[in-house]
Amino acid sequence: MVDNGHVTIAMADLGTVVEIAQVRCQQEAQRKFAEQLDELWGGEPAYTPTVEDQASWFQQLYYGWIGDYIYKAAAGNITEADLPPPTRSTRTYHIGRKLSRQAHADIDASRRWQGYIGCEVVYKSEAEAKGVLRWVGHLQQSDYPRSLVAGVEWRMPPRHRRLAVLGSAAALHNGVVHGERLFWPHEDNYLCSCEPVEQLYVKSKYNLIPPRPPPSPDLLRTLFKVHWYHVWAQILPKLLSDVTALMLPVLLEYFVKYLNADNATWGWGLGLALTIFLTNVIQSCSAHKYDHISIRTAALFETSSMALLFEKCFTVSRRSLQRPDMSVGRIMNMVGNDVDNIGSLNWYVMYFWSAPLQLVLCLLLLIRLVGWLRVPGMAVLFVTLPLQAVISKHVQDVSERMASVVDLRIKRTNELLSGVRIVKFMGWEPVFLARIQDARSRELRCLRDVHVANVFFMFVNDATPTLVIAVVFILYHVSGKVLKPEVVFPTIALLNTMRVSFFMIPIIISSILQCFVSAKRVTAFIECPDTHSQVQDIASIDVPDAAAIFKGASIHTYLPVKLPRCKSRLTAMQRSTLWFRRRGVPETEWYEVDSPDASASSLAVHSTTVHMGSTQTVITDSDGAAGEDEKGEVEEGDREYYQLVSKELLRNVSLTIPKGKLTMVIGSTGSGKSTLLGALMGEYSVESGELWAERSIAYVPQQAWIMNATLRGNILFFDEERAEDLQDVIRCCQLEADLAQFCGGLDTEIGEMGVNLSGGQKARVSLARAVYANRDVYLLDDPLSALDAHVGQRIVQDVILGRLRGKTRVLATHQIHLLPLADYIVVLQHGSIVFAGDFAAFSATALEETLRGELKGSKDVESCSSDVDTESATAETAPYVAKAKGLNAEQETSLAGGEDPLRSDVEAGRLMTTEEKATGKVPWSTYVAYLKSCGGLEAWGCLLATFALTECVTAASSVWLSIWSTGSLMWSADTYLYVYLFIVFLEIFGSPLRFFLCYYLIRIGSRNMHRDLLESIGVARMSFFDTTPVGRVLNRFTKDMSILDNTLNDGYLYLLEYFFSMCSTVIIMVVVQPFVLVAIVPCVYSYYKLMQVYNASNRETRRIKSIAHSPVFTLLEESLQGQRTIATYGKLHLVLQEALGRLDVVYSALYMQNVSNRWLGVRLEFLSCVVTFMVAFIGVIGKMEGASSQNIGLISLSLTMSMTLTETLNWLVRQVAMVEANMNSVERVLHYTQEVEHEHVPEMGELVAQLVRSESGRGANVTETVVIESAGAASSALHPVQAGSLVLEGVQMRYREGLPLVLRGVSFQIAPREKVGIVGRTGSGKSTLLLTFMRMVEVCGGVIHVNGREMSAYGLRDVRRHFSMIPQDPVLFDGTVRQNVDPFLEASSAEVWAALELVGLRERVASESEGIDSRVLEGGSNYSVGQRQLMCMARALLKRGSGFILMDEATANIDPALDRQIQATVMSAFSAYTVITIAHRLHTVAQYDKIIVMDHGVVAEMGSPRELVMNHQSMFHSMVESLGSRGSKDFYELLMGRRIVQPAVLSD
């Protein structure tokens, strides 16, 4: 029996004890996780009262407290520091922490049923049907995907299950439903089923418990729980605003009666005018207070949601991020767009009850005016409601589909920006741009559907109140009654009120539906399991000499496997009544469809070795990150389903890592070295066995993670600065020479991902960060592979054996000559430990000779061994070594591992450019450029004419009713009626035309702006990407494009709507009562001055807000990439504090926009109230002067129109400000379109357009085949594939005008088919040479001949097509193995397998169930760094049409044996190609035809390896001798051809 609270639950059998224990462990883990969250958020920062806190009630009412900020902002000299900070209750820390607590409480509550797993259950209606609860969760392929179901292993199944025929959808199963492995039964039988949890009882000792199904987590519900006060505070001002708005038609009725009365006194009329004035003022103040609270609540929703997303990015498990639908692009989209949609709900949430209330009150008032004649009009109203429901459902479906397409577009854009170097190296720009444009085209199709639905919405909502009033007046006429002014004008006023309510309906519904879609997406991410480290604290056990202990541990990761596609059995009619039907058996709803992927996927799931509870199912759209390669087979919007399947990485690990010692982990590429280190940090799942480790860990990854900060910031990493320690760290990490040449010293910005550092410098900065952290355990993942020989020697002596002496050091390396230095050695092979012991024991095994044969030849010095000292270079090498140590480092940084293009570019060491911020008004050129992109000025002229004509028709209906009611034309009643019906007809069918035309033009503009932006970024020079953070560029494609797609189109539409409405109102007022100009003229002047101040202020605030978003995106992307490093160093709380500070700035800017709008609105509307009072007052004077009945009718019409002027002006001002503020996004997009320096690729636009056209109706695979045909066919005919020749004559190169030369008169010649190695110290110009070959940088002197032609005679893409580039930093993209090695899909499967075999990856890929079609996760996270590099090599080997192969230290992260095998393969299989290799491992180029030694940008030496090494005065000879006796011996053996690895043979 198990005690569950106060109830004793019956365990089913002894086998469930483990499951019960697992549940208890989960509960304990939840408690510990709550403590981790408290530590993550830390204490509340100090608070200083703000200006808003100290404002009086009158200042709060009329927003006087913000006046100083508005005038300062209008002057155009504000920065983020000038923004008033948020109040204590609205700070991101405060609201984010509250939301975090509530969200985790809701998630824990939703998992309450997990506590019953392993308990005995009974079917609700059959007491004899008993079984054991094995699983609780949600079925993916179900018509009720959010319904909680229970997986039960039955002893006696329910009757409806027993009657099912085996093989049918309702049959019992063995834990697999629709190909989805839900759980593993204890008995290997088919006695399992999934039942709705409400159909089960949990059996206790005394009775049956009917546990209530917990509610599913819902971010919206959680937000309302947290911010309930701000939500409820909107009710009172909204109610007061609505009531006073409805009082105005009543007051108008009495005023019209006063004007028509024969004996009315002037005092009564003046009292009515004053009452109308005061009612208007109260309505204005209460409406703006409501807007203030609602928009503030929206800002709180946004910032607290972003804070929660940041927290989740820090705590989400690695397993969750393996899900295809949780890509970086999707997370960025959630922060950029989804939280905005969630926040916007608060702008309109009160209209849920306000709009119906207003309509009901309007109907009651109409009944009061016209009696029973209102009933047919009400029928018209109710007829339109079902139509609105149908349109709403369509909009929701389209919005969900569009959200997934936007995810796909952003993911593809992020991949392009993150891997832009390899994209340019390989000439893939058209492919990537076409894929993004394809996603954009699908997004625009969805946007078109939304726009069409909105036009229908507006048609219905515009037509409904007009038809209602028309029906009323027709029946009024038919009944024989005479229209009178006291009936007509209050009715018109009520009609205008109804128009506002109906006008809000499409906005409300659209906002709500978008909010629901976004909340669902964010909730899915928040629900992802958090990381719960299975590494136990070694301090809990008494093992003083151990730093970590593995005890029979099995280390696993999770990979997604596609499930077979199934379709619903329900008919369309059944689906439409889905929520009204009884929820039946889940499995009966769906059936498996025949598809090429179904059987394979199902087989993959069933054949994969998984453990109990080790699977997790996920869902994604076919347009989303997952399965995009299959979109040719899946209709747009169809879903694809995946299951996360456990994969064993390390098996049965039993290992004790000694404390305070140096442990070296060696093994071939992919053997599991990095996995072992990751397991110590808790990065992987421990499926069996146990693992203990110390908590104080510093981690140096194989690919250094560098923050976009200064050098000082990267080393300190949020620690306090200790000057003495910092200098010592810089010294021992060999950074002194680099610092001496950095113009800003320690304060030099080193760029995003360390873009202006070489690979070795990034490794040393990463190492310096670890050393400065002063931890107990150091995990070093092969940091020496990126270092020069002599630098690596000093690092070993000064850091690993020096400053870190006495610390626990675990070094993963390929360099076997370092093993004598190790206190403990661990050897890995194929995921298993084959040896663990000291060097003496290792030397006595056969492994020692085997590994020496496999791993020998590493580039670092052997001098660290017991028989050779650290300075064991020969006498001849000493001068060179000394010279190498003192090399001028002015060129030591690089683009992707070479030299720095921006060494002296910006003063004080600043590399990253400050984001541009325009000042003053948005220039007219921006408006003109935008209007041109939207179809041209002629099209907008037609649009304005359409708006003017339709507004004239709309105003004519009110004017005609006024004429009809006074009978001034002396026509018959039927004639009045027919003319009125004709006007109504034109009004109803004319209004949708302007909406449709406006949406169409705006959509064209969005398409063209995105296309131009994408093409501009696609051909931008590398210097742009080196100085611009990816987050800043991505902000243009997310936030700014979202504004152009959604916000700006509505802004222009409503701006024109309200502008022409205001014009018609003012014209009618002036024509009817010219004396009203006495009030209008000064009010218009005041309007103008206030608008000037406000627009300038709002514009500057909006610009700050736009800029404030970019650092948020940048920090989020850095956090996702460096999560492992940040968490290991225990700095998550500090990064979160930085994020909260940036979110406070975003909130402040958004809040200031809101309050500034209120500041302006209350002032403008007060002036409007004055105008209304003047109209009424003039009417009173006219009454006293004996005005005619005709004039009285026109005065009544003028007053009726003036009452709408207040709200019209309020919305007009808001839309003017919103449009001008949102035009900042157009300005920002145009800046990247027009101001970015471009490469000369004039054919790019046509290539992309051709590929996008060819994509129509075709799958991705077909498209990418077309890419190579269209982009390469013509060029191939002109320049057939041949071995390349290269001649450089006096080549000079500088990265920018005014900077020093990086290449100084370089001259050499490379013959066809030659194998050339380029060597030299970091900063000598090696990588710059390769960049010059690829024309990533342009030469400023000299000539380069490629295949006998000057390089300048080639087009840029033609030049790059001649070269296959293998960069230093491996970059893989989300997709399949085939797509990564052959993006153009022009190679056969046999050729792909052969290339993988040549680089040593065949066995690794063959181990996947889908082979070369197996999935590569985003960034290649399911492959080791070395394997990623091998994948890049296979990619280059398969590139066709090239005559050169360029390798930039491409084998730095693989073991030497595999490196030699690859080099031998290159020598034979590519004998017809010219190979140019940059290498620090001298043995890599020992068998090459020619060696070029670079030094300070010049060719210091050139010749064959044999010639150079035999010249004892040469620099190359000194470099070889600096390897030490054993290293130089290995080199000479390779040189003499005695140790050549036999290459694999490329099969046909």
UniProtKB/Swiss-Prot annotation:
One of its GO terms (molecular function) is ATP hydrolysis activity. PROSITE patterns: ABC_TM1F (PS50929), ABC_TRANSPORTER_1 (PS00211), ABC_TRANSPORTER_2 (PS50893). ATP 1 binds at residues 667-674. It holds the Pfam family ABC_membrane. ATP 2 binds at residues 1320-1327. Residues 634-855, 1286-1521 form the ABC transporter domain. The chain crosses the membrane at residues 239-256, 266-287, 349-367, 375-392, 463-480, 500-519, 933-950, 975-993, 1051-1070, 1072-1088, 1164-1182, 1186-1205. InterPro entries: AAA+_ATPase, ABC1_TM_dom, ABC1_TM_sf, ABC_transporter-like_ATP-bd, ABC_transporter-like_CS, ABC_transporter_C-like, ABCC_6TM_D1, ABCC_6TM_D2. Keywords: Antibiotic resistance, ATP-binding, Glycoprotein, Membrane, Nucleotide-binding, Repeat, Translocase, Transmembrane, Transmembrane helix, Transport. Its EC number is 7.6.2.2. The keyword Transmembrane helix applies. One of its GO terms (cellular component) is membrane. One of its GO terms (biological process) is response to antibiotic. It is a multi-pass membrane protein. Belongs to the ABC transporter superfamily. ABCB family. Multidrug resistance exporter (TC 3.A.1.201) subfamily. In this organism, this protein is encoded by a gene, located in 'H circle', a 68 kb duplex DNA circle containing a 30 kb inverted repeat. Acquired resistance to methotrexate in the organism is associated with the amplification of h circles with increasing level of LTPGPA gene transcription. This is Multidrug resistance protein. It comes from Leishmania tarentolae (Sauroleishmania tarentolae). The gene is PGPA.
